[in-house]
């Protein structure tokens, strides 16, 4: 080996090795201080890329787990509100069962309906005001997507349904609505009515003109004979009240001589008098209302038992001989109204005036009834249990003050009692139960998703750790090795730097 001064090859070699050990020592110290095997891409380019993807997944899945927990919170909030709605529906059902009992009075039904209305309003309030983080969960149909994964499309959908009184089919729910009007309702509700009722007793049929109370036997008088009229201008049509078996007497129940009353006296009074004149007949004062002519035809009236009674004498549609057999009959009294003016009573032992109540009290069968009010014609069916106007059923409604009023089918539609109220509530409860079940199932699904996300995050962290984290046993060993090499290299470098000194000995 040549002895040179300018170039110290041993020193250069030693310096190079010392630099290597210095780099190794620096890397080991960096890893030990950071805990990471990969502190920059130069440490492991491929490993750094893989670990970074793992980091993205881990962060995304961690947030997804939090999202799933939010989904559980939304479902719990919604389910809690539905539980309150369910409680209100249960109370409404309880009240409806109470309302269907026939022992309730009108005031009872009103009180029940008032509480039902409050409960229904509370359902709407809960629906409109329940929200989660500003999102109303029951006020409208909504599909809420919850991101439960680190990538696009990894979602779970919560179906939020609108739950309020209308969507539950309880809009207008009523247990105290208007009831179908009957003839009796018309009798107690109307003023200034016109029309007629027909009744049958045995083989005989009778027609009572509502506007006048005239009684005509249809079977024996094909044409209209002279009639006895009972005024019904006050609207109280009690002359045809089959349920209560009450009616206004045509005349006071007074005896008549030999079973025959002479109505010619009335005809004569009409013939000889003028409108407004009064005269007495059987102790009753009559007033001439109308006078058709000098033949005795006309109308007179009086007040009996508080009711205005009108007697009309005429020969409409028949001569005196044609209608002598026209009869008005009940099981108790029989009399005949004829143009000749004879009122003949078949029951000679009683000789009482016929009363419309007799028709009612002896099982008269109601036929079809037609009543006109302010130009509108109402029709009652044969049983008298339904009243219609122009083909639509009429209803009786009670105002807040308890006054009964007649309303038509259209007006009653919004107020009428709910058909099958218990079935309606059961349907609403079923819908609420279905939504609650769905929310319960979605909560369980979120729980499962959270568990799976946790497992995935754990495994990804482990995988990333194996790539990215520093192995302290290895790194400490590397550091110790590098430190020893540094010490040895430094010592050897000192020796290598002394080699050129040997050349000086040659110069002595």
From Swiss-Prot:
Q: Does the keyword Secreted apply?
A: yes
| Key words of the record | Bacterial flagellum, Secreted
Compartments annotated for it: namely: Secreted; Bacterial flagellum
Question: Can you name a GO cellular component term?
Answer: extracellular region
Tagged with keyword Secreted: yes
Pfam families in alphabetical order: Flagellin_C, Flagellin_N, FliC-like_3rd
The family note in this entry says: Belongs to the bacterial flagellin family.
- Function according to Swiss-Prot or TrEMBL: Flagellin is the subunit protein which polymerizes to form the filaments of bacterial flagella.
Q: What is this protein called in UniProt? A: Flagellin
